[in-house]
């Protein structure tokens, strides 16, 4: 569906949404009393529209995509200045990505 065909109620930063780790969804209160929902897998697929299951309202979720590198290129990574650094220099597994970032497979 094109943006022109969608009636977007609001645009919400992903930092303002609540993540449910059990259901793997982000949600945000809807004016109807229910909540807008979007699955983490939908975000990874590039979807940015959260819907309310109880009414016709939709919101656009504003987020930054962070790509995960294929296994063959993970040991060496280049920064913006084209300077390589090692995967071991990155934050350890227990650390979360930056607020507003959604990790996706490249």
UniProtKB/Swiss-Prot annotation:
Gene Ontology MF term list: ferrous iron binding; iron chaperone activity; oxidoreductase activity
Keyword Cytoplasm (UniProt): yes
Major place of residence: cytoplasm
UniProt: Fe cation binding residues: 30, 32, 52, 55
One cellular-component annotation, GO: cytoplasm
Protein family: Belongs to the DPH3 family.
Descriptive protein name: Diphthamide biosynthesis protein 3
Organismal lineage: Eukaryota, Fungi, Dikarya, Ascomycota, Pezizomycotina
């Amino acid at each position: 569906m094109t943006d022109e065909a969608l009636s977007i109620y609001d645009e919400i930063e992903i930092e303002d949404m609540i993540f449910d780790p059990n259901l793997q969804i982000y949600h945000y209160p809807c004016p109807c009393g229910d909540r807008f929902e979007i699955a983490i897998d939908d975000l990874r697929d590039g979807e940015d529209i959260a819907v309310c299951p109880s009414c016709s309202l939709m919101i656009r979720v504003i987020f930054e995509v962070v790509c995960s590198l294929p296994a063959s290129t993970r040991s060496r990574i280049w920064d913006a200045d084209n300077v390589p650094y090692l995967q071991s220099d990155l934050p350890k597994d227990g650390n979360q990505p930056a607020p507003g970032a959604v990790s996706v497979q490249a």
